[in-house]
Amino acid sequence: MNDVTTETYETLKQSVLHTFAQLTGYNVSELSLTSHLENDLGVDSIALAEIAVSLSRQFQLNTPLLIQDINTIKDALDGILQREFQLSEKVEPAAIALSGDADLWLGNLVRQIFASHSGYDVNALALDAEIESDLGIDSVSVASAQGELFNTLQLNSETIIANCNTLSALKQCLAARLVQEKGQDWFEQRGRGQSDSAIDHDADTTAEVTPPTATPVAINAEIGDPRTMRDFVGIEHPDIFHKAREFHLFYQDKKKRQLYFYGMPLETPCKNRAVMFDEATGQHREFLMFGSNSYLGLSNHPEIIHAIQDAASLYGATNTGCRIIAGSNVLHLELERKLAKLKGRDDCIVYPSGYSANLGCISALTSRHDLVFTDAINHMSIQDGCKLAGAQRKIYNHSLTSLEKSLAKYADHPGGKLIVTDGVFSMHGDIVDLPRLMKLAERYGARVLVDDAHSTGVLGKTGAGTSEHFNMKGQVDLELGTMSKALSGLGGYVCGDGDVVEYLRFYSNSYVFAATIPAPVAAGVIASIDVMLREPERLAKLWDNIYYFRTRLLNAGFDLENSDSAIIPIVVGDDAKTLFFGRAVRARGMFCQTVVFPGVSVGDARLRISITSEHTREDLDEAYAILVASALEVGVPVNASAHQEENASVAEA
């Protein structure tokens, strides 16, 4: 039987596990090679067919995997190995025998470099700890750390070692690659302390290390540069601007092909329709606007505009200071009282932005002794707040079953515990199961923070958000949000117990050391809350629009995941097809967001549609027709009835 190196086997195994996790919703850590796909994991034949096709394409197999041959993940792995290496039997990885010194040397180097990229003390990094779920080190940091390891060890290969779960697994893969490229003797010398400048962190190795050069890419006539935005994160190069130069070439190519259209400027108020300057075509065009988060249409309400104008005349343009020095205005205090009352809490603190609210709150209340449990698809401001705090992040899969397993695993942790979740998930549109989450928090002694950025003004009888939606108003420890969406202003806030809010005012750096929102903005948000509560018909109209449009899209066969809010995703998956889909939609006069990495994971690309109360039934019908026609143009699946509708409309035209 042919031998397969540890590196080859481990890399393939982790890639296969990652693909199964991505397409089934499991965490990689929850998947066993020997679990029966249908009986143990509930993977049906339809899902398995998608996985088999994805793996066959991923590994460019001449003979595709057949679902009848796959009962376990190991069956799929063995099938790939047999096709890749023409093996006649199933294989196990060949072990690499290293001396204790060499193994210790490489393990210490891996820990040292990962410590520098993650903020951990090197002594806190256990080799057998799960990189993501135990240590909370994200994929961007992993890629950056691996890049430094490749440069430090002067490895020829530029291929990132895919998805090793632990530092120990990564160490094994590096060992195999080192033995292959440099030989066993070189490796053993390192372990005996006979290191060269390539692994001397105190030496200046810039002149000796040849930076990796960009691998030539085949430019496809349609997609152009085949890279994704993920490929420009953590590029190792002596010039820190190198990644920017590379990205510029990539971005200009995408703009030229009208695939990227980020930052198109508005030339009129943003309502159900808006005029924008289309930089790709050089035209001033009116679009159906489905990219606005002004869910209740308050951003153009005359009463709110007048409130902003009056406050500017009375208090000036801005306060030019932070709140605890000379930046507080009576309107800030009034706004905090209104927000606290809306949420049913004692007090409220207003931050310069929703992003800074998450950063400031999480970093002030947690430290390295504490655990923060965060949903894998939480907003980036939550993830960054966890990093800034230095607390141990425990990322759970987008499932409360996954959260429960993680809480149970760390039930005896002596430090504090905080569960952080979006109320409405910003790129997916689904709503957290708050009652179940609160029961888990109570059982395991954890506090809860809910980010209501896309819930306030959308969920609940009065628009108060997630807790009101579940009749749990005032029961969540911390309710956080932004005023830049339904409330049509700017800034973020946290509502909670009075003593907790008081603590945040003095220990939340993004509040203490930052200028606050201008008084006119505060006046506008105060007016927005008043109008929202006084005109409940806006919320009723919003939900009428959501139900109508969502039903039409579902009947057409679009994949909307579990959306149940004003955010409706149309999930495509493939980046290139999603970019073409977005281009076709925009060409027909509809503006919505085309979301690829880093907004979502690579392979989870989508269009993101935002519904507002300002949309008319005619707007929704026209948008539906545009989406169906565009989907048919680029090959996004729709069902037969939608296809017939499109043919009929074309015939009438």
From Swiss-Prot:
Cofactor(s) recorded in Swiss-Prot or TrEMBL:
pyridoxal 5'-phosphate
Q: What happens when the gene is disrupted?
A: Cells with an insertion in the ACP domain of this gene show an white phenotype and produce 2-methyl-3-n-amyl-pyrrole (MAP) but not prodigiosin. Cells with an insertion in the aminotransferase domain of this gene show a light pink phenotype and produce less prodigiosin than the wild-type.
Where do the TM regions start and end? Answer: 512-532
Q: What's in the keyword line of the UniProt record?
A: Aminotransferase, Antibiotic biosynthesis, Membrane, Phosphopantetheine, Phosphoprotein, Pyridoxal phosphate, Transferase, Transmembrane, Transmembrane helix
- At which positions is substrate bound? 379
Q: What class of enzyme is it?
A: transferase
Topology class, membrane: Single-pass membrane protein
Kindly list the GO CC terms recorded for this protein: membrane
What sequence ranges are listed for the domain Carrier? 7-84
Known consequence of changing residue 139 to A? The pyrrolyl-beta-ketoacyl moiety is formed
Main localization of the protein? membrane
Known EC number(s)?
Answer: 2.3.2.-
Q: Name one GO molecular function term.
A: pyridoxal binding
Q: Where does pyridoxal 5'-phosphate bind?
A: 354-355, 426, 454, 482
Q: Which residues carry this modification: O-(pantetheine 4'-phosphoryl)serine?
A: 45
One record GO biological process? antibiotic biosynthetic process
Q: Which Gene3D superfamilies match?
A: ACP-like, Aspartate Aminotransferase, domain 1, Type I PLP-dependent aspartate aminotransferase-like (Major domain)
* UniProt keyword DNA damage present: no
Report the pathway entry.
Answer: Antibiotic biosynthesis; prodigiosin biosynthesis
| Consequence of substituting residue 45 to A | The pyrrolyl-beta-ketoacyl moiety is formed
Q: Which residues form a coiled coil?
A: none
Location in the cell: Membrane
Role of this protein: Involved in the biosynthesis of 4-methoxy-2,2'-bipyrrole-5-carbaldehyde (MBC), one of the terminal products involved in the biosynthesis of the red antibiotic prodigiosin (Pig). Carrier of the L-malonyl group (malonyl-S-PigH), which is decarboxylated by PigJ to yield a C2 carbanion acetyl-S-PigH. Then the pyrrolyl group of pyrrolyl-S-cysteinyl PigJ intermediate is captured by the C2 carbanion acetyl-S-PigH to yield the pyrrolyl-beta-ketoacyl-S-PigH.
Q: What is this protein called in UniProt?
A: 4-hydroxy-2,2'-bipyrrole-5-methanol synthase PigH
Which source organism? Serratia sp. (strain ATCC 39006)
